[in-house]
Amino acid sequence: MQLVLRDIDQGPFLSKVLAKGQADDTLSGEQLAQIKSKAILMSLKLADKFYNKYKMHLLEQAAHDVIGVVSLGLMELSNQDQQQALRLLITADGVVKCFQKGWSMLSVVSKHKLVNSKSLYGDVDKFLLEQVSTPPDADEWLGYEAYQDALVEHQRQQSIAALMAQFYAQTSYDPLDFLNLESVLAEAVLYRMLFDNAKVRQDLKKRIAKISLQDEWFSLEYIEQQTQQALAELPAELADTIGKDLGKNFAPALLRTLHFAKSYRELLLNDASPERLERFEHKEGLVGLLGWPLYIVL
């Protein structure tokens, strides 16, 4: 493995730390050799597990994977402080700890990506590892940004799962459905409003004809109150995260959907055909009806 030491502001964090250590005379030649030796050993182990270690280009790929994963773990363990990072690297198991941390980070954010598929790299998504992997002398390393994007998506999936578990009768879902966090919460708030805080089922379009819509529901204040009431049933940290993620148009959009629900109910009471109801939905624009269920009534 070649670890090129030069001043690269945007390169892999591992290379940046080693270059600074050399420049500041805080990293000796012997210490550098030990770090490189441990990184090479890590590359051989990775190649033996996932690649063909006897093919030079695959061994090189494993080395790039190690540099990226170690850089990621090193950033996390050192809080991106290069002096602290160097002190960690020169410890006996510093490189191993950084790799294990980086791999663990990638594994966590890969979970939802691997629900319906398998990865060459076990519990780490192949595409994500490819984004993190880097040669040591890369002018630009976007591995940390790729991880951050994956982390945001992972947290979004966790939030959706928590909403489903708390407010839906059917708690499992396929991440490939690309559910929208706002829509999942909005459907729960709407359903709870209509059916006395019941868990969401795929029966709103049939049941709505059997209830009376209260005048007090048709106000932004009431909808905001119902939204906060729902969020209060979630763990505080999660509720705060979801609340901050909601757009300013959440309550107005849900109020529009409630007015639509009133018109839909009137059509039901007038024995409108399923085809007419479906046309009415599409005329209003299903995408613009926040919280309105998308399933088809047969």
UniProtKB/Swiss-Prot annotation:
Disruption phenotype: Deletion of the gene leads to a dramatically reduced growth at low temperature. Keywords: Stress response. The keyword RNA-binding does not apply. It comes from the Bacteria. Interaction with AtcJ stabilizes AtcC. Involved in cold adaptation. Interacts with the C-terminal extension of AtcJ. Also interacts with AtcB, but not with AtcA. This is Adaptation to cold protein C. The gene is atcC.
